[in-house]
């Protein structure tokens, strides 16, 4: 096996498939990474800025060239702005994942989401009490609707803090309070991060980074935590499972379907579909012995925890899974 592939992956099957990809002239993530070398030195140090149309600007890290952007931002401000915007993008991604699940929960409550149901009524009631909702005498669907509405309020701008922040240790919350970084609303903090980091707004790098921390907390104790709780309510609480992993989970005699993504809303229905007698019969009619559903990356992990499904690999293995030629979907 070519020595170069040892630098790409520790797995033998991954190395074999990298060689196959090269022979088949299939471009992979490693090829694209190599083509990007050498990376821009200004970008690697965070000293380039494209936040307004007066740029792009860059600051010389050795003090020999420009030390400020056109707007007057120095190295500290540019680095802080760039980091804050990266945090805002990540917080928006995770938190929107949570919003999708809350919207599904609301549709379940309203009877507008066939195929979905409340799998963990106990968890539903437990989380509802954290939102100060009365649970006694209410059926699951009524309570689910109320909880979805309450969670949507956490995305807004009218609250003093996101609800589930109360789970954090009191001493830790006191530190955040003193620093002034208690997140007030999930969308609010992301929007403000984009506002603060624009040209001519916040020109104090300490202030920018403090808000970046607040934005991160709005995700960790807001959007991401909501996503976790609603996933458990709708799809069941994950349990320790025995499973298998790596490319070898693909099966030659079956229809191989790979789920890959960030949100379990679709993947859970794929699990149900792969167990449907009609589709199993169709697979057999086409000459397969059945359907083999495997996971890659985040959604694959969710299915492994809830259903024991095998994992074909992480997100860097996505293209190599396809290089096998054994994947139908």
Regions found by a protein language model. Give the residues of each.
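Metallocofactor- and cofactor-centric catalytic cores in central/energy metabolism, strongly enriched
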Residues: 2-329
């Amino acid at each position: 096996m070519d020595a170069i592939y040892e630098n790409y992956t520790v797995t033998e099957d991954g190395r074999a498939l990298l060689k196959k990809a090269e022979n088949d002239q299939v471009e992979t993530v490693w090829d694209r990474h190599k083509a990007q070398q050498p990376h821009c030195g200004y970008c690697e140090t965070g000293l380039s800025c494209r936040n307004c149309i007066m740029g792009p600007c860059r600051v010389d890290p050795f003090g020999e060239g420009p030390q400020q952007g056109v707007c007057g931002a120095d190295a500290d401000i540019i680095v802080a702005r760039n980091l804050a915007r990266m945090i805002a993008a990540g917080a928006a991604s995770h938190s929107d994942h949570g919003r999708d699940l809350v919207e599904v929960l609301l549709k379940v409550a309203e009877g507008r989401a066939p195929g979905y149901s409340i799998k963990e009524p106990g968890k539903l009631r437990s989380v509802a009490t954290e939102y100060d909702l009365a649970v006694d005498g209410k059926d699951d669907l009524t309570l689910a609707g109320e909880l979805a509405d309450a969670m949507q309020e956490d995305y807004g701008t009218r609250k003093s803090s996101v609800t589930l922040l109360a789970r954090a240790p009191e001493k830790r919350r006191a530190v955040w309070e003193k620093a002034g970084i208690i997140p007030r609303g999930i969308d609010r903090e992301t929007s403000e991060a984009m506002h603060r980091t624009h040209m001519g707004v916040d020109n104090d790098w300490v202030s920018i980074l403090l808000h970046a921390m607040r934005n991160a907390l709005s995700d960790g104790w807001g959007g991401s935590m909501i996503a976790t709780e609603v996933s458990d309510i709708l799809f069941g609480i994950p349990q320790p499972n025995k499973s298998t992993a790596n490319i070898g989970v693909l099966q030659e005699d079956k229809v191989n379907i790979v789920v890959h993504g960030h949100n379990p809303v679709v993947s859970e229905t794929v699990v149900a579909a792969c167990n449907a007698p009609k589709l199993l019969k169709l697979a057999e009619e086409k000459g397969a012995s059945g359907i083999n559903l495997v996971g890659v990356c985040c959604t694959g992990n969710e299915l492994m925890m809830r259903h024991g499904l095998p994992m074909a690999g992480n997100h860097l293995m996505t293209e190599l899974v396809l290089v096998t030629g054994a994947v139908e979907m």
